[in-house]
Structures are given as C-alpha cells and as structure tokens.
C-alpha cells in the first residue's frame, strides 16, 4: 500500500533522517515515535509530498508518490498537520467541505453526493453537531475532529497525521486515539501518525518506528520494538526507566532515608504502596515469602 525504500529526508542540503524503510497496509496504524527534533514531521511531510526526498522513493500502490498529480494524490491520501489553522469565519461544514475539492467542478460547486459525504465524514468522528458552528468558536478538541472530518471527506485510503493530540487535554487525547483505531478498522484506512504519548501509541499501533540520530533505530511490531533498553536509548533516560509491564516510564528511586522496607506483593497489588514509598525516598525491596 504505502512503502518507503531507502528514503532520506531533510531541508536544503541538510539530511535529517536517512535509510528509511517502512511499509504499511490498509487497516493498519503505523506510529512514529522519537524525541523533539528527530525528524518525525519532516518524514511525514516528505511522504505527503510537501517536501522532496533527498534520496530514495515513496511508493503508493506501487507508484512513485512524487510523480502523481496533486488532484490524483488528494483522492488517495489526506493529511492533518500540527500547525493551527485559521479559516476565518468558516463553519465546520465549510471546513469539512474543503475535503471535497478534488471532486468538485471548476467553480467548487457541491453536489448532493458531496453534501452527503461531508455529513457522513463529520458523523464518523462524532462531530456532526459542529457543522453549523463557527470554527473560531470551537475548542481544540472540536477543531481537531473537524480537521479529521475534512480529511475523511477526501475519501482517502491513507491518512497522515502529525502529532494530532498536541493541543488536547487527557480526555480528548484518549477519544482521538480511539477514533484513529476505529477509522483504521471500520474504514480500512492505512494511518501513519506521529505521537509523543508512548502509552497511547501502544494501545493502537500495529507497527512502530523509533527515530533518533538521523535514522530509524527500531521498526516493527510494538511488542518487539518497545523494549526497555531501546526506549531508554531513544530518550537518553538517566533518571527513569521504561517499563515494558506498564508501557510507560518509572522514575528511578534515589533513597535518602536510612530505612530499608521490604514489600511483599505480587500481581500488581503493591503498585500504589511502592509508588508512595519511592516518592517519599525510601529504600524499597520487593519479593515474596518462600
């Protein structure tokens, strides 16, 4: 479906990431993870043809993606970037309608089918109630829903999203993450997304790519990629460790109290007690009775 072959990306004469070999099929989600400045956004913009590759090729259904005409590509791929948009006094309906541009006539007139798809796209992201609302009056979470609805209105087979949860609170982050999984499953979309939240990425990803130091340091199924030593290296962790059990980070314990406390627990029963003791800088040992 979508494939990169020995791809190198960057700006001007500067190569940000090189030797990228990724592949994603319809119905799958590929999450790209990495520290700030690693080149995640540059990679997505190259895949979306906003930037030309420094080397290598991006294929879409076996065709070189940078050779496709913009209108033809817009019918196959939709993109939602991080940058905030300012469409003035446009309503949610007007913004979603932009997604029909590849299909409208010279004057941009909407057919009844176009209008039906606009409503269905908003409904797919639980945003039908926002169609008559002015975009500037919407919350960040509502705006993101409308932007994804606009992308869906293009009737794409591939959806590219750059850090879609950046401006969202915890509730809307979870809702959006679950929405992406739903779209991949129900609409059979191939989704490529960059995320900062590893915990959420693990919940939805079929494949993960970790980027650091100008290259992809790990790529594959999450359970094979998200190993403690790999994630610790990815973020140069000194005062924390990535836990494969909980799928997130645990702060290292630097005890300052002389008492050593032995905690008998198992099966996650001691988690709250252990966190309390570590937070209060006790020297903690864990085990079970023989």
Swiss-Prot record:
InterPro entries membership: AAA+_ATPase (IPR003593), ABC_transporter-like_ATP-bd (IPR003439), Metal_Ion_Import_ABC (IPR050153), P-loop_NTPase (IPR027417)
Annotated GO MF terms: ATP binding; ATP hydrolysis activity; ATPase-coupled transmembrane transporter activity
Pfam assignment, any one: ABC_tran
Signal peptide coordinates: none
Keywords, in A-Z order: ATP-binding, Nucleotide-binding, Transport
Domain ABC transporter: 2-238
Gene Ontology, cellular component aspect: ATP-binding cassette (ABC) transporter complex
Chain sites annotated for binding ATP: 34-41
Keyword Repressor assigned: no
Residue ranges of coiled coil: none
Gene3D superfamilies in the cross-refs: P-loop containing nucleotide triphosphate hydrolases
SUPFAM superfamilies, A to Z: P-loop containing nucleoside triphosphate hydrolases (SSF52540)
Matches recorded under PANTHER family: IRON ABC TRANSPORTER, ATP-BINDING PROTEIN, METAL TRANSPORT SYSTEM ATP-BINDING PROTEIN TM_0124-RELATED
Sequence similarity: Belongs to the ABC transporter superfamily.
Protein's recorded name: Uncharacterized ABC transporter ATP-binding protein MJ0873
Source species: Methanocaldococcus jannaschii (strain ATCC 43067 / DSM 2661 / JAL-1 / JCM 10045 / NBRC 100440) (Methanococcus jannaschii)
């Amino acid at each position: 479906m979508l494939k990169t072959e020995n791809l190198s990306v960057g700006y001007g004469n500067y190569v940000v990431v090189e030797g990228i070999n990724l592949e994603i099929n319809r119905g799958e989600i590929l999450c790209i993870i990495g520290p700030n400045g690693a080149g995640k956004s540059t990679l997505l913009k190259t895949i979306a043809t906003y930037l030309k590759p420094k080397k290598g090729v991006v294929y879409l259904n076996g065709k070189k993606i940078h050779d496709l005409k913009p209108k033809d590509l817009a019918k196959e791929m939709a993109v939602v970037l991080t940058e905030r948009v300012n469409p003035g006094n446009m309503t949610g309906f007007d913004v979603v309608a932009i997604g029909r541009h590849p299909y409208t006539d010279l004057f941009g007139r909407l057919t009844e089918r176009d209008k039906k798809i606009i409503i269905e796209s908003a409904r797919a992201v639980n945003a039908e109630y926002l169609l008559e609302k002015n975009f500037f009056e919407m919350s960040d979470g509502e705006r993101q829903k409308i932007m994804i609805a606009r992308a869906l209105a293009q009737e794409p087979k591939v959806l590219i999203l750059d850090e879609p949860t950046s401006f969202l609170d915890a509730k809307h982050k979870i809702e959006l993450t679950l929405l992406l999984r739903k779209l991949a499953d129900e609409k059979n979309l191939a989704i490529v997304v960059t995320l900062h939240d590893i915990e959420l990425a693990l919940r939805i990803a079929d494949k993960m790519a970790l980027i650091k130091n100008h290259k992809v340091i790990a790529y594959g199924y999450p359970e094979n990629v998200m190993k403690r030593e790999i994630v610790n290296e990815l973020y140069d962790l000194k005062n924390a460790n990535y836990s494969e059990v909980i799928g997130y980070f645990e702060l290292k314990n630097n005890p300052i109290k002389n008492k050593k406390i032995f905690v008998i627990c198992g099966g996650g029963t001691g988690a709250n007690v252990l966190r309390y003791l570590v937070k209060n800088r006790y020297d903690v040992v864990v085990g079970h009775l023989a």
